[in-house]
């Protein structure tokens, strides 16, 4: 049995989207159970529409809901211990749930997750990983916004975290990993990226196939299973891709409605356009995963519909079922056992920074 905690108040639509999504997933996954947190007067009416959902879920009233415009510090100060978001994360820490899903404020969710779950022993900072549609299927891209700027050690952490996710979600025994750079040549790029590349080449990990540097267009091509970058570049790449997808969709709609012949052509090509729309739909790959924490937290898009939120739940379900955390911890232990200098140099950097 896999138990998923749900922040029912998160996102633009709250329980009106969240509760139908739970019913969808419960139908597909008979071994799933839900622990739902939210405001009773808003959640109960939605739950009443799906009587069978009561058989596989528990509901707990929370008076406070974190707003989408709350600053992380405000959300942590006012929502700790009593908000639906905090309770959903706390359920993972206590063992009441195996994973947490929320469509709420990203900054607040990350702040609460870090405060409540803490990072893994050898991880400096967590990362947000996204599933990215590609010509070959999907890739894991991280970090897409948690850490602005990252040193070589943190990029290696991200590579190991992303590898664990790819193994859990894609079922690939040895995922290919690439470092996002301004060129594929080893002499190009920032020193942190070049140093991370050197260390990954020398690591020779059984669970990871280091490909080398990749460029921006390699993400969509699906050149590698895991693309590693720091959060500033990753977030810009993600938002650019989402905007480009919407732009292309707009172009197609305009072109297909311009003339009578275009409209007739659309009727005959509708199935092809539907497949294209499905491939470009962000909702199909909905869910940013907070990696590097002592627990699984999935952030759904705030504007996701019920199908999109269901996709985020199923992503969390798959990672629990495929032992994501155990895989990551084993990979981290193996890397540091083979590269003890990496951890010692990191500790010395921390000491130096403290002295400065």
Swiss-Prot record:
Gene Ontology cellular component annotations, sorted alphabetically: cytoplasm
Domain of life according to the entry: Bacteria
Enzyme nomenclature, EC number: 2.3.1.274
GO biological process, alphabetically ordered: fatty acid biosynthetic process; phospholipid biosynthetic process
A UniProt-annotated Pfam family: FA_synthesis
Localization per record: Cytoplasm
Principal location class: cytoplasm
Coiled-coil regions listed in the entry: none
Keywords, alphabetical: Cytoplasm, Lipid biosynthesis, Lipid metabolism, Phospholipid biosynthesis, Phospholipid metabolism, Transferase
Signal peptide: none
Reactions the enzyme catalyzes: a fatty acyl-[ACP] + phosphate = an acyl phosphate + holo-[ACP]
Gene3D superfamilies per record: Isopropylmalate Dehydrogenase (3.40.718.10)
InterPro entries: FA_synthesis, Phospholipid_synth_PlsX-like
Pathway in which this enzyme or protein is active: Lipid metabolism; phospholipid metabolism
GO molecular function, one term: phosphate:acyl-[acyl carrier protein] acyltransferase activity
Complex formation: Homodimer. Probably interacts with PlsY.
Membership in a protein family: Belongs to the PlsX family.
Function: Catalyzes the reversible formation of acyl-phosphate (acyl-PO(4)) from acyl-[acyl-carrier-protein] (acyl-ACP). This enzyme utilizes acyl-ACP as fatty acyl donor, but not acyl-CoA.
Protein name, per record: Phosphate acyltransferase
Naturally occurring in which organism (per UniProt): Mesorhizobium japonicum (strain LMG 29417 / CECT 9101 / MAFF 303099) (Mesorhizobium loti (strain MAFF 303099))
Encoding gene, per UniProt annotation: plsX
């Amino acid at each position: 049995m896999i138990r998923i905690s749900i922040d029912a108040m998160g996102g633009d639509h709250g329980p009106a989207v969240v509760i139908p999504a739970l019913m969808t997933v419960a139908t597909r996954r008979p071994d799933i159970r839900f622990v739902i947190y939210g405001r009773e007067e808003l959640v109960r009416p939605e739950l009443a529409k799906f009587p069978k959902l009561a058989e596989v879920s528990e509901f707990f009233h929370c008076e406070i809901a974190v707003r989408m415009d709350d600053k992380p510090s405000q959300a942590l100060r006012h929502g700790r211990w009593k908000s639906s978001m905090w309770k959903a994360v706390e359920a993972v820490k206590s063992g009441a749930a195996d994973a947490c899903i929320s469509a709420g404020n990203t900054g607040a969710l990350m702040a609460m997750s870090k405060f409540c779950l803490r990072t893994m022993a050898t991880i400096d900072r967590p990362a947000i990983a996204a599933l990215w549609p590609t010509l070959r299927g999907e890739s894991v891209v991280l970090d897409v916004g948690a850490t602005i700027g990252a040193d070589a050690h943190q990029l290696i952490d991200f590579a190991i975290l992303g590898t664990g996710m790819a193994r859990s979600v894609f079922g690939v025994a040895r995922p290919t990993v690439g470092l996002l750079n301004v060129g594929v040549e080893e002499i190009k790029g920032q020193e942190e990226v070049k140093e991370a590349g050197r260390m990954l080449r020398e690591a020779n990990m059984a669970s990871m196939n280091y490909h080398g540097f990749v460029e921006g267009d390699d993400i969509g091509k699906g050149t590698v299973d895991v693309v590693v970058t720091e959060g500033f570049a990753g977030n810009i790449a993600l938002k650019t891709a989402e905007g480009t997808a919407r732009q292309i969709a707009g172009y197609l709609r305009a072109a297909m409605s311009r003339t009578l012949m275009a409209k007739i052509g659309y009727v005959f090509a509708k199935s092809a356009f539907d497949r294209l729309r499905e491939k470009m739909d962000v909702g199909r790959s909905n869910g940013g995963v907070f990696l590097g924490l002592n627990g699984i937290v999935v952030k759904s898009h705030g504007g996701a519909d019920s199908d999109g939120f269901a996709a985020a739940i199923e992503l969390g379900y798959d990672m629990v079922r495929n032992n994501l955390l155990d895989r990551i911890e084993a990979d981290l232990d193996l890397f540091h056992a083979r590269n003890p200098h990496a951890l010692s140099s990191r500790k010395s950097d921390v000491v130096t920074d403290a002295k400065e």
